[in-house]
Amino acid sequence: MAVVGVGVDVVDVDRFAATLSRTPGIAMRLFTPAERGLARPERLAARFAAKEAVAKVLGAPPGLEWHDAEVVLATGGRPSLRIRGTVAAAAQRLDIASWHLSLTHDGGVAIAMVVAES
């Protein structure tokens, strides 16, 4: 396997929470129903950072749908990516075979790092 791309994103949790509260419907546009179930702002901010990091790995092609990159929990609670639709198509064009995801939130910021391999 070879590294195809690395994406990192940082989100200010308070600013993100304020955006969610003042913009009706934004959570519906950004997150899957399962992701929205994690109502704590720092968890949603980390998942948004992950989606942004995925877009960076893919070169931010136009037309990516936020719901097509979903953060799920793998065995043992480790975060993992489930991709479909527009994200899966962009990943296929880059011959991406596997994804690695790390999330953290502390001190008012949420950070995601994504590594894609062929």
UniProtKB/Swiss-Prot annotation:
GO terms for molecular function: holo-[acyl-carrier-protein] synthase activity; magnesium ion binding. It catalyses: apo-[ACP] + CoA = holo-[ACP] + adenosine 3',5'-bisphosphate + H(+). Keywords: Cytoplasm, Fatty acid biosynthesis, Fatty acid metabolism, Lipid biosynthesis, Lipid metabolism, Magnesium, Metal-binding, Transferase. GO terms for cellular component: cytoplasm. Its main location: cytoplasm. Disulfide bonds: none annotated. The keyword Lipid biosynthesis applies. It is found in: Cytoplasm. Its EC number is 2.7.8.7. It comes from the Bacteria. Its cofactor is Mg(2+). It is an enzyme of class 2 (transferase). HAMAP family: AcpS. Belongs to the P-Pant transferase superfamily. AcpS family. This is Holo-[acyl-carrier-protein] synthase. It comes from Frankia alni (strain DSM 45986 / CECT 9034 / ACN14a). The gene is acpS.
